[in-house]
Amino acid sequence: MKNWIVGMVALVTMVPVMAATPWQKITHPVAGSPQSIGGFANGCVIGAQPLPLESADYQVMRSDQRRYFGHPDLLNFIHRLSAQTHQQQLGTVLIGDMAMPAGGRFSSGHASHQSGLDVDIWLQLPKQRWSQQQLLKPQPIDLVAVDGKRVIPALWQPQIESLIKLAAKDNDVTRIFVNPAIKKQLCLDAGADRQWLHKVRPWFAHRAHMHVRLRCPANSLECVDQDTPPPGDGCGAELESWFQPPPPSAKPGKTLPPPLPPSCQALLDNHFATE
């Protein structure tokens, strides 16, 4: 679990309810050439686009929360992945949170997903399309056993591994966060084709979905990428460390969000000045 303290604020995707943020008051994308700005956990996006809610290959959950916006690169990835999934007859891809219309910090649910390059994709592939009621109030399938050390065999399906593998092999994808037990199962099942596994990173929670992160777009000059994952498949000592008791440490104090990138602060200032 190396460097987990450093990465905690930036990467954890399920966080306690936070105070309301001004970003959720921006109801439409900011006009302009698409630009992802700042980091994944402290940024925004100009020229975001909404993911079309109607598709033969995927369905969008909780559309009433309006978290289905992203940089065009993210939309293109979702279309590619869902088309490949459909072609292989794996099932319908279920799309969870992406970003808000201008990106920025959510009031609840995530610390990242701020620059329009993150998407949550559920690890279930229904053969029958969900009803509108199911999409608005989706029921996740927890794939991980109570002890957190393994997946539940009755729930683990080969299609899930195929979905994760397809995403990991996409050139625009830099990281996929899953529960350590899911990563462990992928390591066991991968066979000789293992190069894609280094993109699949163990992380807290993520028991029913994968969190896919894309690289900074080439023309987004203010976008801040993460360092590339370490070489190798990540199936050795690093993965095993996640199943060890954490070292004792002092109770962490409350932390304030870091200052926004100047361009994101200017975006907020300009938006609310013209209201």
Curated annotation (Swiss-Prot):
Its main location: periplasm. It is found in: Periplasm. Zn(2+) 2 binds at residue 147. Zn(2+) 1 binds at residues 110, 113, 120, 211. Its cofactor is Zn(2+). Residues 244-262 have a biased composition (Pro residues). Gene3D superfamilies: 3.30.1380.10. GO terms for biological process: peptidoglycan metabolic process; proteolysis. Keywords: Disulfide bond, Hydrolase, Metal-binding, Metalloprotease, Periplasm, Protease, Signal, Zinc. Murein endopeptidase that cleaves the D-alanyl-meso-2,6-diamino-pimelyl amide bond that connects peptidoglycan strands. Likely plays a role in the removal of murein from the sacculus. This is Penicillin-insensitive murein endopeptidase.
